[in-house]
Amino acid sequence: DAYKKKLFHLCEQFKISNQVKFIDSCKNMALAYKVSDIIVSASIEPEAFGRVAVEAQSMEKLIIASNIGGSNETVINEKTGLLFESGDPKSLSKKIMQALTMDESLLKTMGIEGRKNIVKKFNVEKMCFSTYSEYKRLIN
């Protein structure tokens, strides 16, 4: 489609075609995350959960996500990932440049911190207790 062609053209114009991969659909997401260094979730509409941000962090990958919806709650800016102003391409491009110029050890550390964050927030015991507490609140 026209938008995709425009994105390809921009990648060529800025000489980053070899560094950017556009994926339409993927059957093996674990592998896709594994071979990636940085994940971008550029949602312009709030997602209730922000699954891409959670998946990326669980795979110890740096996530760059818009600061709305679930991503805003699961990504700790500058610690477990990078948040940008939703709908602001300049904010997104600054975060991408920050990630691309980041020291490899910091990139790794942020990935590890992201996984710790997700495991802490979304372990089965905590989620069950949270669900139980909500049901209890609704019943009373």
Model-derived regions, located:
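Conserved donor-nucleotide binding/catalytic region of nucleotide-linked donor-dependent transferases
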Residues: 98-116, 120
